[in-house]
Amino acid sequence: MDKKLSNFLEKREHTVLTDIDVITAAVAVPLLEIDGEDHVVFTVRSNKLRRQPGEISFPGGHCEPNDKSSAHAAMRECSEELGIDLDQIELLGNLDCLVSAIGVKLYAVAVRLHTSDLKPNPDEVGEVFTVPLQYLLDMEPTVGHLDIATRPLKDFPFHLLEGYNIDWKIRQNYSVYFYPYKQYTIWGLTGRVLKNFLDIYKDVK
């Protein structure tokens, strides 16, 4: 039996098993030159959307099966959301892959927009605004923290675990970064991506 098991296992590659559904997505951090100064482009999600309506985000979305790479997915979404041709979007390179506490595996890339003639898709984008890059580089974000906790549900077999506590159990916590600008506050996963980009940019600079 060991031989059969060994022959079977040697053909297998590791797969990632998770306790939660993982969504794979990609976003672009777009740079746009305005009056000789670089700005970072943000979108406000349309109120028509089912998920996170009205939230500030970078252009992006789910990675589709026909996307050649996560970078291609991010640029495709950027083109669709901002209403510009793909050839007006230059890939500058990869940032990092962020995994959120709720199971979003997010690949981020930096891009350069070679047109300011943006025609946002109203089905996805309610508003587009820009923030001067230097303003963000000079800012120290406000940092808050959230707990990640678990709680047994009704079908949990307490009878198998004598004395098991039914209360919430805090497992860990994580930092949340807030970047206020005018009437906007950039935070959440978008804030984490922004911080990742700014940290890398400062290292290069």
Q: For each predicted feature, which ranges?
A:
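Short, charged, solvent-exposed linker or helix-capping segments at domain edges/interfaces
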Residues: L118-D123, E140-P141
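Flexible glycine-rich active-site/ligand-binding loops centered on an Asp-His dyad
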Residues: V128-T130
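N-terminal leader/linker segments that precede catalytic domains of diphosphate-processing enzymes
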Residues: M1-S57, H62-N94, L98-Y107, R112-D117, ...
